[in-house]
C-alpha cells in the first residue's frame, strides 16, 4: 500500500482500508447487510500478512463486542462493525466497556427497523447511539459521516478520541453512505504501536504485570455503593470534558439564511440539494450539520437558530434528533420535522415542499 492513495470505492470498503492504514490491531465482526463489505474487504486485503492486524469473523455480535472489550483492555486499537439489530446485541458489551473505561471503536451502518426490519438505510438508531444504549449512566462518542471520505477519515479520529478519553467511540453511518461509491483519498499508513509504546501510552492496560508496578485491574464492578458512586462521578466529569472540547459540526449557506435545516449523515447530503433548489426559488435556507451526535452541538445550534425564522430537522426516521434540536432552540423559533421511514430515503423535492408548508 502506498503512503496515500486515491480510489473509487464504497463507504464500507473505505472504512476497512482506513482501519488497516491507521494502525488498527484487530477487527472482530459478523456479517450483516448493509455493512458486510467491511469484513469482506478486510478478508480480501489480508492485513495479518502485512501489518499484523488480526481479523476474526466471530460466532455472533455478542462475541464480537466482547473480543473488542478484551483487546481494548490490553491497550490495543480494536474495532467491530455491524448494522442496527446487530449493534443492539452489542449493547451489554458497550456498557461494560464504558463502565470499565475501555477504548474501542464500534461502527453502525444503520438499516431500517424496528426488529429485523429491512436492509434499506435508516437513521433510526440515533437515540440508542446518543443516549447510551445499554444499562447505566454513560455515553459514547458518536461521529456521523456524510461521505465516503469521512467514513475513512473518522476511523483514525474515533480511535484517537477513544484512547484520549478511555471510552468507546462509535461511527454512526447508514446504508446510503456504506453502499455508495465516491472518490476517496485513503490516509497515509500509520504503523501499529509497539508493545513499548502501548506500555508508555496506556499505563492502565492489562498487558501482563511489569516489574515494579502494581497489577492493573479493568472492571465495571464495584460492590461498595460509595465507591460505585465515585466511579460514576468520575465518568460524569469525563463526559463534561468531552462536551467542552470535542463538539464538531459544519455549516453551509448560513451567512444570509432566513431558515435552517439541521441534518446529519446522508440526510445532510439530501438537504444540500434541497437548499440549492429552495434558493433557486428565492428562499434563503442554510445547513447545520452535526458531526458529533454526542457530544451534541447544543450551544452552536442555539446561536445559529437565533439568526433565523425557523428550523427544519431532516432525518431518515420518525423524529429523534429533533428532540435535541428543540432543547437547543428552547422555543425561540419554530422547529419542524421531516422524515421518511421503512428504508425510504427522502427526496429533495419533498423536503422543499415540507419547508414551504411548515415554515415559509
Language-model region placement:
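N-terminal glycine-rich anion-binding loops that anchor highly charged ligand groups
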Residues: 7-44
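Thiamine diphosphate
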Residues: 37-131, 143-163
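Peripheral docking tails and interdomain loops at the edges
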Residues: 315-360
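Glycine-/acidic-rich phosphate or pyrophosphate-binding loops and their flanking alpha/beta elements
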Residues: 10-14, 236-259, 272
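Conformationally flexible catalytic loops at phosphate/diphosphate-handling active centers
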Residues: 166-251
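Generic long, charged, amphipathic alpha-helical segments
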Residues: 271-304
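Structural signature of the thiamine diphosphate
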Residues: 140-197, 350-360
